[in-house]
């Protein structure tokens, strides 16, 4: 068995290696949504492909990468997110239930992508209790967040959790999408980006 941390390192190294071969590192957009099975994305050709097509996600899959052999290490929100972020199983990273947390300094995906020369951002549902401090930029829902009229936490002058932006008239999906589009428009263009875009 290969430890998850090593797999995460190998994947990061592979992306950096590809970038050095072709002279330019690829931008990376990681989209996550809660309870979203692969067969719900028509690019995978599942039973829902004709009933509920996903043409925009299909286009992204065609132009980028489509994981054909990926596994969820935990079936609930916080632990699953912690595994992706740390590259570790939950019994190692400590996030074993919905009260899970990943402390700054252990948010390895953000740290390693930053070391590889990427501008890192986390936008949307975080649900890991503590500040996503290892990202260059973040704009995250507090806890599970609200579906309608959400607030998001941002980095600012006040302590973690006190710097908020409210979206009283929006659904969380629209607010998260708008925040991501604004960040993509305003970000530093001289660096490639690694963006974790998480829906509720």
Language-model region placement:
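Short, Lys/Arg-enriched N-terminal segments with co-localized hydrophobic residues
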Residues: 1-3
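Formylglycine-dependent sulfatase
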Residues: 5, 11, 19-200
């Amino acid at each position: 068995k290969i430890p998850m941390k090593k797999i995460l390192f190998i994947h990061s190294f592979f992306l950096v290696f590809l970038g050095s071969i072709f002279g330019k590192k690829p931008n990376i957009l990681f989209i996550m949504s809660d309870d979203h099975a692969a067969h719900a994305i028509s690019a995978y050709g599942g039973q829902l492909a004709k009933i509920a097509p996903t043409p925009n996600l299909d286009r992204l899959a065609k132009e980028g990468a489509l994981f054909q052999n990926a596994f969820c290490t935990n079936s609930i929100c916080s632990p699953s997110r912690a595994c992706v972020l740390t590259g570790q199983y939950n019994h190692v990273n400590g996030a074993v239930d919905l009260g899970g947390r990943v402390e700054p300094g252990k948010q390895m995906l953000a740290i390693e992508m930053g070391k590889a020369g990427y501008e890192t951002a986390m936008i949307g549902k975080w649900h890991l209790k503590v500040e996503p401090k290892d990202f260059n930029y973040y704009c995250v829902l507090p806890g599970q967040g609200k579906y309608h009229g959400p607030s998001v936490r941002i980095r600012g002058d006040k302590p973690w959790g006190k710097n908020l932006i409210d979206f009283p008239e929006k659904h969380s999906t629209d607010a998260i999408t708008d925040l991501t589009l604004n960040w993509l428009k305003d970000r530093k263009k001289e660096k490639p980006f690694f963006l974790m875009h998480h829906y509720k």
